[in-house]
Amino acid sequence: MSEYRLTCVNNSSLHGSFALYQVPPSAPGPMGPACLAWLARPAAPGTQVRFSWSTEVGFIWGERGTFGGRTTFTAYQYVAADPERENLIDFGSDSFGAPTFQNLRTGGAQGALTIRQLNATFDFPIHLGIALGKSPIYTVDFNVNVLGAFIPHRNRCWVVFGSYTAGEAIDAEAQTNVQVVDFNPS
């Protein structure tokens, strides 16, 4: 697995945080995945921050909630995957009714991570999606008997400066002054 580093410099007179996020390759709009601030770090004027992460990808589920007017995601389970091999997993409940991933295997679309959402009911809202470097990048609402495919950008990220925390939902379509950073995978 590759590991990347990115240094961001705050050359402004503003206090805030740099946030890294991903934009899903398709399905924008209300039914598309929620983009999350996958990494975030505060930077005072005249300072710099460094991010580093692994390009390991995997499946993730948890809860999304609102606190202080911000929507954030808290992860409860992570399962490492490979978009070219073990890229299909089932999501449902165990014999006690607890939400869980199970049955990681080959068989999903090449280059994508696919979640088969089984027939299950939960007493609280479940969100599931994918992670990069074990941090969530996109999530969707759990929907019974739906197949969800996600394509991670392992070698690209979007950077924005403002008031962000890791796990916070970002409206990618509303962002301005965004920097897209591409990494050479070799």
Question: Where do the protein language model's features map onto the residues?
Answer:
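Intrinsically disordered, low-complexity segments enriched in small/polar residues
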Residues: M1-S186
